[in-house]
């Protein structure tokens, strides 16, 4: 009996050994088993992982099956021209490698669009798989990236035609022209045209690309290529996809970053956030769950409770099962594009809260937008857009103005993000506007990196600017003046300078301080409404501050006669007005320049002419003698009422404010010809004939033209007028000396009197007091040479003993 028992045990052991051997052979013979299957998933819920991987894995073939598959597959060699084009695409047309994922998702979206369209007329089109999704999965262990869609799929013929052939008619001519354009440094975007070759961007990051596809009208096939040749064969596993396509990339070593979940998620959000179909990424998250304790853990815990003197005894029936909190990694599909493109809906159907929520999500801002506009543009190019004005100006708005690219306008084509790297989508002065532009028919070049036809971009730009200005115009006056103008007023002024075609529209948005109100700002429309009956010009005065502008001698008579004067207090203001020739048929008049005239009666005209004749000796004396090289001419002023004189620029010269701004420029070197020309223009010296100083000067000049006091007075008046008119003095020391001389004369002090010399100080006696006391000398001698050296080095003051 014992012998039979031993024999039976041996048989069982032998049988078990054969079974294990068979299992080991089967495992060893499998190469690339479960290609694409993530090992992270297998460490968690096996059933979930198996179910999900069945829909996304490429194959589960063993080594012999893979060898047979590759031996029986039909191989195709890329033609020389196609191979050349492939290299051109990989090396030349794509500016950055990360766009490969955008292209693959875009192709997947196109395939989903096609099957959805087919399903409208064919009720069985979605029978194989009713889902319409894109799924992305990373397999770091096997260096694989999978992109699966449930779109229309491809037949064998379509795999060969669509993925194996890029060549079109005239390919050689196309390549030659492109090569010539590159050698000449010209743009190739016009030559490229619209090729459907975004798929080949996969070779930017992959050594090998494997495509498994199932079409409703054909069996499932596998397409494989290393960019040199490709092969196609029927999938021996049969129909594992149901319908759709899986693209598997065997990534290059330097492209391993694209296996990181964060990298893939960021790329999906960046480029494909608004795709119409849901995009999922197989990702993990850590959850804290409670699990029952094992028996040994429970026993240990009960022992610890028993040993604890402070433990509270619990009744048997109240005891609950022992559990512990455990952190567990859970894998599942995470939706990436949960933000819907609200610009695709009619504006009437979108609530205000939806616009605000979209703006905050889109711009990463916490505040609501100040204004927004949602519109559809039709014509030469059709697109939909939503534009926003932020509540506050972005930080560094004018840093590198004009050279810094604006990334606030994002361009989409069929909800696929193309670029926000623009120099010319919006003009520089509107660099604060944020928004999206989405077009279904915008032509792109092969790499989607640059717009194919720049004229269409100009059409889009033109419409965006018009809509933006309409949006700004509709902002309520109170909000506009209190908020918008403080944040973006400088932008509007720059727009007047830069945008000639929209200058009239922008002029209506301008706001300035004026003499009409001490604090409120005014528009040009409001100024024109308040103009006097026969006033034909808009008067303005520029200064570094309102106080300087309104205290200028140039505005004295204007304010006295009731004319409103606009105050320009910002450095850009005078440039802005100079670029604006007129507004509503009214020309602008700088009151610091020539040309200010008032309506006068015949009697007033006769009085003015008589005054000019009376002061003709003084005017000629100033022009030909006292101020000979300093002024263009001297005239009797019509604009002064309180000040004795003023220095007026010519129509084409610089005002004092403009000269100060130009000389303060960091790049000003003094070598610019035009700058030197404007700066060297002589001014007109206007005098007030009713001022006592001027009348007394006339009397003195008539008595003695060579009177030195009058000569000094004329120069001092000129230099004072230079300062009050906003100009800088070339020699401030000479001006100070003349003022001092005038003060001496007014106090009856001799102009030649010298400053009293300071009394010379007597040199201090450095010798030490000595006495005849022999005992003191003896004590000092006994102090030793060492103490004397110390006293000499420290230069101590004589002690009380020494003084005695």
Curated annotation (Swiss-Prot):
TM regions (residue ranges): none
Modified residues (N6-(2-hydroxyisobutyryl)lysine): 168
Catalytic activity, EC: 3.6.4.-
Entry keyword set: Acetylation, ATP-binding, Calcium, Chaperone, Disulfide bond, Endoplasmic reticulum, Glycoprotein, Hydrolase, Hydroxylation, Nucleotide-binding, Phosphoprotein, Sarcoplasmic reticulum, Signal
Sites where a glycan is attached: 62, 107, 217, 445, 481, 502
Motif placement: Prevents secretion from ER: 801-804
Keyword Acetylation part of the UniProt annotation: yes
PTM annotation (N6-succinyllysine): residues: 404, 633
GO annotation, biological process: actin rod assembly; cellular response to ATP; cellular response to manganese ion; ERAD pathway; negative regulation of apoptotic process; positive regulation of toll-like receptor signaling pathway; positive regulation of Wnt signaling pathway; protein folding
Superkingdom of origin: Eukaryota
Residues of the signal peptide: 1-21
Motif window: SRT pseudosubstrate motif: 42-44
Amino-acid positions noted as binding ATP in the UniProt annotation, renumbered to this chain: 107, 149, 162, 199
Post-translational modification: Phosphorylated by CK2. N-glycosylated cotranslationally at Asn-217 by STT3A-containing OST-A complex: this glycosylation is constitutive. In response to various stress, 5 additional facultative sites (Asn-62, Asn-107, Asn-445, Asn-481 and Asn-502) can be glycosylated post-translationally by STT3B-containing OST-B complex, leading to a hyperglycosylated form that is degraded by the ER-associated degradation (ERAD) pathway. In normal conditions, the OST-A complex together with CCDC134 prevent glycosylation at facultative sites during protein folding, thereby preventing hyperglycosylation.
N6-acetyllysine carried by residues: 479
Phosphoserine: residues carrying this PTM: 64, 172, 403, 447
Main location: endoplasmic reticulum
Site positions per UniProt: Important for ATP hydrolysis: 448
Annotated GO MF terms: ATP binding; ATP hydrolysis activity; ATP-dependent protein folding chaperone; low-density lipoprotein particle receptor binding; protein folding chaperone; protein phosphatase binding; protein phosphatase inhibitor activity; RNA binding
Localization terms from the record: Endoplasmic reticulum lumen; Sarcoplasmic reticulum lumen; Melanosome
Self-association and partners: Homodimer; disulfide-linked. Component of an EIF2 complex at least composed of CELF1/CUGBP1, CALR, CALR3, EIF2S1, EIF2S2, HSP90B1 and HSPA5. Part of a large chaperone multiprotein complex comprising DNAJB11, HSP90B1, HSPA5, HYOU, PDIA2, PDIA4, PDIA6, PPIB, SDF2L1, UGGT1 and very small amounts of ERP29, but not, or at very low levels, CALR nor CANX. Interacts with AIMP1; regulates its retention in the endoplasmic reticulum. Hyperglycosylated form interacts with OS9; promoting its degradation by the endoplasmic reticulum associated degradation (ERAD). Interacts with CNPY3.
Stated role: ATP-dependent chaperone involved in the processing of proteins in the endoplasmic reticulum, regulating their transport. Together with MESD, acts as a modulator of the Wnt pathway by promoting the folding of LRP6, a coreceptor of the canonical Wnt pathway. When associated with CNPY3, required for proper folding of Toll-like receptors. Promotes folding and trafficking of TLR4 to the cell surface.
Family the UniProt entry places it in: Belongs to the heat shock protein 90 family.
Domain free text: The SRT pseudosubstrate motif associates with STT3A during translation in normal conditions, preventing glycosylation of facultative sites until HSP90B1 folding is completed.
UniProt name for this protein: Endoplasmin
Source organism of this protein record: Rattus norvegicus
Gene: Hsp90b1
